[in-house]
Amino acid sequence: MGLPEERVRSGSGSRGQEEAGAGGRARSWSPPPEVSRSAHVPSLQRYRELHRRSVEEPREFWGDIAKEFYWKTPCPGPFLRYNFDVTKGKIFIEWMKGATTNICYNVLDRNVHEKKLGDKVAFYWEGNEPGETTQITYHQLLVQVCQFSNVLRKQGIQKGDRVAIYMPMIPELVVAMLACARIGALHSIVFAGFSSESLCERILDSSCSLLITTDAFYRGEKLVNLKELADEALQKCQEKGFPVRCCIVVKHLGRAELGMGDSTSQSPPIKRSCPDVQISWNQGIDLWWHELMQEAGDECEPEWCDAEDPLFILYTSGSTGKPKGVVHTVGGYMLYVATTFKYVFDFHAEDVFWCTADIGWITGHSYVTYGPLANGATSVLFEGIPTYPDVNRLWSIVDKYKVTKFYTAPTAIRLLMKFGDEPVTKHSRASLQVLGTVGEPINPEAWLWYHRVVGAQRCPIVDTFWQTETGGHMLTPLPGATPMKPGSATFPFFGVAPAILNESGEELEGEAEGYLVFKQPWPGIMRTVYGNHERFETTYFKKFPGYYVTGDGCQRDQDGYYWITGRIDDMLNVSGHLLSTAEVESALVEHEAVAEAAVVGHPHPVKGECLYCFVTLCDGHTFSPKLTEELKKQIREKIGPIATPDYIQNAPGLPKTRSGKIMRRVLRKIAQNDHDLGDMSTVADPSVISHLFSHRCLTIQ
């Protein structure tokens, strides 16, 4: 497995680009010697030794790492028990069951009291507007988390209760999630870009007792009245027979009138006035965050939890359309995110880390909040977007805080590539040491630009493959050890045993392409789908008994490098966010004009993939630009702006098999104007296809 070290060469600007573009996968880049010298894992040989031990002796490997954390009581029985084979009984995974700990205690109290990091900055907060900044130390964060833990307890929240959080990227979001963890309640964070319908659905699915939200926030130029959306969601919950008893509201846009701007422990006042924001108030349900915090004590004993107690629920799109509540547990998740953060980003105490992901996604949970804090890191917490107020924003923040490790999505890289090198190169970026990508496979052109322009050919790139379900990185380079190939996630992380299977479930050796699966558990694996263990078993373990099935296709090359080829199921990856085709289709057919809908992915130069929708109209309705806009609006309201389609085509008929199944592979070909359709023997009405080709939308590649 892997490349002989002597065959590996460093990249050399444009020549490297040409070779990567034409020669493709043979090209590789060695880790810079100055990175390897100080790295936790300094060579490919050392990586292989550690990986072999982690897979062959997982109990000993992770047992040693567990000793670095505080346990109220040790593990009384087996360190690991599991079953991955549905034919042998119920699927279960148990790491350190019976041991008790608290993740909030481990990431805050220990750093403040044992490691004496109380005065170290935990987060530099950078607001939407440049100049709108604050910072919060580990001690200040601990005090605020204890205060809000007491607030939650006073509201009757107990261990095992679920709390919904619907907030922008502000320090109170981190405080809220850690307070839940401190008292043993499960946080269910809903991305603030999701609609009220999506929020309602998630509150109902996990029966959340309480909602935490914000008055409003700006995303670039756009004002988002989050409280209004939260009110709509709570009204929908009430109508469906589930009244949420309490909603705690952070006054974010109204901070100036609270006089909170000078305190380092609070986010500062917004610089842009919002006289037009009307915040409705529901007496008896709504409570102001700042008023509750003023009355709360600043000490709070943590709730000691079993390692296998649930820590949080995070919803991810499911191929059936209904989102799945992914459940992660206290002990295993803590070990895994702390360890992946330390090794994948080669973290050292003086680093300033910046993950641009929103905490509403798993990347934000693992690598904005829990992973960095578990390592005592200083991070940047960014509320804004890469292009506001201009395309210099990310690089000016890198220079401002002297960011050393930078983690973002290929979508952001492709977006910024469009504006050329100058907005990047006019900033120093001298502090950068490691670059990372997450959310989707990165195309080689974007990788090369990231390496050459952003990293000035001196920063290793960690191209990380993982999922909401895995908790942390699964396939990834290590900065000081792994020769990089543009577009490859390279090799498995510690404890990860990948395999590639064919359709019959046989493991393929050497160069191969097929289904990516994992053969044994790692501590960060999800334990169940909330309230639906059967769905957990069916989705991830039924197709190939004995394996965790990712749903992704994968190639392994002659050097043993893994290349993710994309989703095999009916899922789309838009700007690094997984969307279900079924979810979008059902939002379309809810419109009175639409009889039937089919949604496929289409290549997009910035998003990676975008939505191309085919709609069959009901009798009496005509296709028009007005209808197209109505359908887009409907999807935004039902799911959120992230799911807005780029293309909607009128389809008087859809290609179907004789049994009535929509042939989505044919629709994908039509969307891309690719007439090489393959075997069409099962199509019921071939004339439908020629009509769709002749009326397809004009697309960009």
Curated annotation (Swiss-Prot):
Positions of modified residues (N6-acetyllysine): 418, 661
Motif Nuclear localization signal, chain ranges: 656-668
Binding residues annotated for CoA, in chain numbering: 219-222, 363, 575, 636
Region (Disordered), start-end ranges: 1-41
GO molecular function: acetate-CoA ligase activity; AMP binding; ATP binding; chromatin binding; propionate-CoA ligase activity; transcription coactivator activity
Region (Interaction with TFEB): 1-107
PROSITE patterns, alphabetized: AMP_BINDING (PS00455)
Documented activity regulation: Inhibited by acetylation at Lys-661 and activated by deacetylation mediated by the deacetylases SIRT1 and SIRT3.
Catalytic activity field: acetate + ATP + CoA = acetyl-CoA + AMP + diphosphate; propanoate + ATP + CoA = propanoyl-CoA + AMP + diphosphate
Alphabetical list of Pfam families matching this protein: ACAS_N, AMP-binding, AMP-binding_C
Family: Belongs to the ATP-dependent AMP-binding enzyme family.
Name assigned to this protein: Acetyl-coenzyme A synthetase, cytoplasmic
Species per Swiss-Prot/TrEMBL record: Homo sapiens (Human)
Protein encoded by which gene: ACSS2
